[in-house]
Design a protein with these regions (language model features):
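Short alpha-helical transmembrane segments in multi-pass integral membrane proteins
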Residues: 1-18, 72-139, 185-242, 298-363, ...
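N-terminal transmembrane alpha-helices
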Residues: 6-34, 38-39, 52-71, 96-103, ...
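Transmembrane helical elements of multi-pass membrane transporters/channels
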Residues: 13-29, 133, 167, 200-204, ...
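Residue-level hotspots within pore-lining transmembrane alpha-helices
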Residues: 20, 24, 28, 57-61, ...
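Helix-terminus/linker motif at the lipid-water interface of multi-pass membrane proteins
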Residues: 23, 27-45, 114-121, 177-188, ...
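Small-residue-rich hydrophobic transmembrane alpha-helices
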Residues: 44-104, 141-160, 259, 270-336, ...
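Short runs within selected transmembrane alpha-helices of multi-pass transporters and secretion channels
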Residues: 65, 134-152, 160-171, 193-208, ...
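Structural signal for membrane-spanning alpha-helices in multi-pass inner-membrane proteins
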Residues: 106, 149, 175, 179, ...
Length: 498
């Protein structure tokens, strides 16, 4: 008889280091914004514009490359550690390609992009060269993420936590040197914040390389002893990673678009939205960290063909995520005025932010359902359908509902926060349906009538292969994409033996 408490302890042992690493990464952005602000308003505005354009793309890139986590965890669960170097090299290759594409896009489109924004000359100058430094940031992060996937799965999540904890103080030192121009270095203002960020991630990459190369368990020498990459590994990396990256991009781009619609309500409303959004983003790190931990644990359990263990981790994940969300939501509502005053001394802005924070509490509760399920499905390498469901929830639910509440019902700026709550609620509902469907397939039950998407299979246990085979006929009748199924089956040459 297993103990739920023991499973929760195991989940927390993986999750908490991830949470600390996430907070450390957020600390870099906070330090950049704060120190650039002291350099001048133009520097702060330039950094804000550059960061607003860059970070949705960066989050998408990280989401894509984090696909290495379930791939490596599955290999470890299957007792096939010799496959780790190929997956890592595949991730590094994809990272190199992404870095090249981002650099090429900067050269080709930066002039037209900044012109279309009609920024003041000083702000545009800072934004241009801040984004230039981000080319280096993309390269370093694209190299770090596959190595982090390796240390989190084959090693311990505490390793990446310790390394990321070094980043904020290092970043602060570089900011001090380059933003303000101390010790004979040029005073670069907001551009210096970008340069400091690039150097910080370069420093982190060196640390990750040292850790990987010194550990025999991480097979560092085997990774860099050869440049051989398996096409199948790269393909699987992209199959799992691209939908995850696109899901993040679609979600973050919606948040950016909402700012455009809120602009007509004035500066105070925009500032209040930024406060509530920033605080909600900090709280969001809790379910995201839980989701990442669930991906590692469930992928490892599934790789070992231990489906009951995967179910136990799923249950522990919901307990942790919902308990955490209940506490953060209650604290958000109770201390909303204090939170607003912590960000600004403007009483009007703080009051509006307090109202927005009430809505964010509802958002947190729905996120505690949706985000862990995404981690569970990633652990099962089920990401393509999740991406489609996220698009439906946010762009088919949240965005239209926000516009309806604003322009038809006339609720004003509150419409967009209510729309976000509705969108996250739709996402939670759709994720639950998807998880129920996947579990019914794994339980050898007939496909439910709402199974409008097929259960994608790549390298799951033989029992699951057999279950999928037994439902092929019914699945093809329910699916809107039978040709895609046939193409996938031929490419992977599945042989099912029920």
């Amino acid at each position: 008889m297993y103990s739920l408490i023991e499973d929760i302890k195991k989940l927390l042992s993986v999750m908490l280091p991830i949470l600390v690493a996430q907070i450390s990464t957020a600390g870099i952005t906070f330090i950049n914004t704060t120190m650039a602000g002291h350099a001048g308003s133009d520097d702060l505005a330039g950094v804000s514009v550059g960061a607003g354009l860059f970070y949705p793309l960066l989050a998408s890139i990280v989401g894509l490359l984090m696909a290495g986590t379930p791939l490596m965890a599955t290999l470890l669960g299957e007792k096939k550690p010799e496959g780790l170097p190929y997956v890592v090299r595949g991730g590094l290759l994809i990272g190199l390609v992404i870095s090249f594409l981002f650099g090429a896009a900067y050269v080709l489109f930066i002039d037209d992009l900044l012109t279309s924004l009609t920024l003041e000359a000083e702000v545009a100058y800072v934004a241009r060269y801040y984004l230039m430094t981000m080319v280096g940031v993309v390269f370093f992060i694209s190299m770090i993420v596959p190595l982090r996937c390796l240390t989190d799965t084959a090693g311990s999540t505490s390793t990446s936590m310790k390394l990321f904890l070094m980043a904020p103080p290092v970043n602060a030192v570089f900011n001090y040197l380059f933003i303000y121009g101390h010790f004979g270095l040029p005073r670069l203002g907001g551009i210096g914040a970008g340069l400091a960020t690039m150097l910080t991630y370069g420093f982190l990459l060196v640390l990750f390389l040292i850790v990987v190369l010194k550990s025999s368990a991480l097979k560092g020498h085997e990774i860099f002893h050869s440049i051989l990459v398996k096409r199948s590994d790269v393909k699987e990396y992209l199959i799992v990673g691209v939908p995850s990256g696109l899901s993040i991009f679609m979600e973050m781009s919606l948040f950016s678009l909402i700012i455009v619609f809120l602009a007509r309500y004035g500066t105070d409303t925009l500032a209040a939205y930024q406060i509530a959004d920033n605080f909600a983003s900090l709280v969001y790190m809790l379910p995201v960290s839980c989701s990442m931990a669930l991906t590692i644990l469930i992928a490892t359990a599934v790789g070992a063909h231990d489906i009951p263990l995967a179910r136990r981790y799923k249950k522990a994940g919901f307990v942790v995520a919902l308990s955490g969300a209940a506490m953060t939501a209650a604290m958000t509502v109770l201390f909303r005025s204090s939170i607003g005053n912590m960000y600004t001394s403007d009483a009007i802005v703080a009051s509006i932010a307090g109202q927005f924070l009430i809505y964010s509490a509802g958002w947190q509760l729905f996120d505690a359902i949706s985000t862990p399920i995404q981690g569970i499905l990633r652990g099962l390498k089920d990401t393509r359908v999740s991406f489609v469901l996220m698009v439906i929830a946010y762009w088919g639910g949240c965005f239209p509902m926000s516009l309806f509440l604003d322009h038809v019902v006339g609720l004003g700026a509150d419409s967009y926060w209510l729309g976000l709550v509705f969108g996250v609620g739709c996402s939670a509902m759709l994720m639950i349906l998807r998880l129920v469907y996947v579990e019914r397939v794994m339980d050898r039950e007939a496909l439910p009538s709402f199974a409008f998407f097929m259960h994608r299979k790549i390298t799951h246990p033989a029992a699951v292969h057999a279950v999928v085979a037994s439902n092929v006929k019914q699945a093809k009748e329910l699916l809107a994409f039978p040709d895609l199924y046939m193409q996938f089956s031929k490419e992977n040459k599945f042989v099912f033996q029920p």
